[in-house]
Curated annotation (Swiss-Prot):
GO terms for biological process: neuropeptide signaling pathway. The lineage of its organism: Eukaryota, Metazoa, Ecdysozoa, Arthropoda, Hexapoda. This is Hypertrehalosaemic hormone. Its main location: secreted. The modification Pyrrolidone carboxylic acid is found at Q1.
Length: 10
């Protein structure tokens, strides 16, 4: 999950 590893897509 790219959003999860990036901090919820922030």
């Amino acid at each position: 999950q790219l959003t999860f590893s990036s901090g919820w897509g922030n």
